[in-house]
Structures are given as structure tokens and as C-alpha cells.
Amino acid sequence: MSQYDVEPLLSKAAILNKYADLPQNGKVMAEYIWIDGFNHLRSKTMTLDAKPSSIDQLRVWNFDGSSTGQAPGNNSDTLLKPVAMYNDPFRRGDNILVLAACYTADGSPNGFNHRDACAKLLEKHADKETWFGIEQEYTMLDYYDRPFGWPKGGFPGPQGPFYCGVGTGRVFARDIVEAHYKACLYAGINISGINAEVMPSQWEYQVGPCAGIEMGDQLWMSRFLLHRIAEDFGVKISFHPKPILGDWNGAGCHTNVSTKDTRAEGGIKAIESYLEKFAKRHKEHIAVYGDDNDLRLTGRHETGSIDKFTYGVADRGASVRIPRSVAMNGCGYFEDRRPASSIDPYLVTGIITETMFEH
């Protein structure tokens, strides 16, 4: 039997609802979520006697790191340290979602834990009052890894009608997008908007503004919610920066940045000084801005070239865009358009902070 003989097994929501409202006899379900060795997410659940009032009341747990690409089989126990807590939109009630960071037995960060170093760097420069906002683009795929809603054996019409589209044939799977929006709000994610993207079956949502380490924490949790909701519809979520080769837009994680200085009167000068530093460290940034980003940063489809740093006002073909409103007001924020949709936000917010304040 090939994979093409298998149909996706959809969630049976109506049946599940018979059990979802059963009383839990005072117990609380806490789902621990972590980043694995493949830039994806894993989770497992434990039962608590009561809802914790702070993250410090949650215990350190562990998992088999050899099964997630994070540890060898002869020393596989990897520690899960809770770092952020959210309302659970799936189980509701007092149940919670717990974002956890991975550590080795000696207490040092696991090799795939980029949060630890990022948190220290952001805390070091907390006086700069840096705010981040990330635009997460993603592509919906069907069970056979074909963009969801695309014609079988063919392609949709050229790009044009799909960006912020309305109507059948112009947008696909809006119900997943709406469900994710509501779930993020319920969970406590600072989701600030959604829109259909240029390529059909591609969407975007925005998280932020967030200060400090919350940017990375909230983006990862929002991705978890998206994957879980898509499960119910038998749809896969791809964060690949160029899921379909050819004359189609790629997917990015445009990262918006402002500091106390850029938001102040005359802050455009601070923005320009930061971008001069960015130009000198372009290669270092590209190195952590996502795998396969060379397929996306071609200078076409609203991207700059991966080989050259540029910036400009209202220029979506530049590495960094200064919004028209910022140029007119003389202060505000800038948008780094280089990060791919698959980024680890801890690496991206970390290197941006490092470049602005330590170079």
C-alpha cells in the first residue's frame, strides 16, 4: 500500500465533545510543549492537583531526547524546564499549555535550546526597551503535501487575486485561520492580525508587539496552536520558505523592530544607525535567518537578494523596509524582511539585539 492509498483521519469533534465536558474532579491537565531537534514541536501532558498561579509552581519534567533528535540513546533523558504558561483553548477550564525549554542532565542548555542565550542577551539590554513584532507566513498543504485547494494535477491562476482575498476560489481554508485566531486570543497570545497572502493557500498572522523573550515564546506557542488546529481538518502546516518553486511568492517571518530611541522624536536617525550596523553583519544574520532561504531571497517576489544588504522607504524589494509612515513621522520602527518563515525567533531576536547594541 502506498501513501496515496491512505486517506487522512480527521478529528471526530462531535464524538470528542461527549467527553470534553466531563468533570476532572479538581485535577488540571498541563500540556508541556518543546522545540525538538528538527525545528518542530513536541508535547506531552501531565496531571496536576491544582492550577498553578505562577510558572515557578510547575515542576521540571523529562523526555526521551533520543526520539526527538536531541540526545544519544545511551544518555537520552532530557529535562523540560517550564518557561511560559498559557490558557488551553482545546481542553479549556483550568487546563494549561506550558512552554518548556530543554536542558541536559547537568543543567546546561540542550544544543537546540536557543532560548537560554537569547533571554540573557535581551535582559542585558532591557534598558533599550526593544519591541518586536513578527509576521508569520505559512502554507497549508493537503495530506499528500500539495497546497490545499489547488487543482489536482494542475495549478491555480497566476498570483494577483489571492492577497487579502475574499470569496471562493480566492482564499482557502479560512475556517482554520479563524479558529487559530480565536485560539491565540484565548490562550493569551498577543496576536495582532491575520491576512491571506499572495500565493493561494498561504496565510499570515502577526504576533506582537512583544518585549524581550516573550516574542520568541509567543511565536512558538502560536505555531503549536496552528499545528494542533490543522490536525482537526486533516491539513498540514508548512513553514518552508519556498514550498512551491517557480513564479510563486515564498514565505517569510518579517520581523518588525523598534527601540526607545527609534520611537522617540527624530528616531529615524537611530534607525539609520542600526541599519548601517546591519549592513556590516549581513552574512551573520543570513546564517540564522532560516534554512533554504536562498530559494526565497532571490530579488523577486517582494524579496531582496540574499547576497546584498539594502534598505529603503516603502521598498518591499529591500532587505529592510522603513514604512512610509515612519519616514513621514521621523520615528517608529523598521521591518527586517530577510527572516524565513521557518526561523527560530530566539536566534533572530537575539542577533538583531546583538547587532544593534554590541557592534
Swiss-Prot record:
Q: What class of enzyme is it?
A: ligase
Annotated GO MF terms: ATP binding; glutamine synthetase activity
Q: Extract the InterPro entries matched here.
A: Gln_synt_N, Gln_synt_N_sf, Gln_synth/guanido_kin_cat_dom, Gln_synth_cat_dom, Gln_synth_gly_rich_site, Gln_synth_N_conserv_site, Glutamine_Synthetase
GO cellular component term, pick one:
cytosol
Q: Which UniProt keywords apply?
A: ATP-binding, Cytoplasm, Ligase, Nucleotide-binding, Phosphoprotein
Subunit structure, as described in the record: Homooctamer.
Which residues are in the GS catalytic domain? Answer: 114-359
Positions where Phosphothreonine occurs in the chain: T303
The family note in this entry says: Belongs to the glutamine synthetase family.
Q: Using the record's annotations, give every residue carrying the modification Phosphoserine.
A: S273, S305
Which organism does this sequence originate in? Answer: Schizosaccharomyces pombe (strain 972 / ATCC 24843)
Q: What gene name does this entry carry?
A: gln1
Q: Which PANTHER family match?
A: GLUTAMINE SYNTHETASE (PTHR20852), GLUTAMINE SYNTHETASE 2 CYTOPLASMIC (PTHR20852:SF57)
Reactions catalysed:
L-glutamate + NH4(+) + ATP = L-glutamine + ADP + phosphate + H(+)
Where does the protein end up?
Cytoplasm
Q: Does the keyword Ligase apply?
A: yes
Q: What is this protein called?
A: Glutamine synthetase
Q: State which Enzyme Commission number(s) the record gives.
A: 6.3.1.2
Query: Where do the GS beta-grasp domain residues begin and end?
Result: 28-107
Recorded hits in Pfam families, A to Z, give: Gln-synt_C, Gln-synt_N
Set out the biological process GO terms recorded for this chain's protein: ammonia assimilation cycle; glutamine biosynthetic process
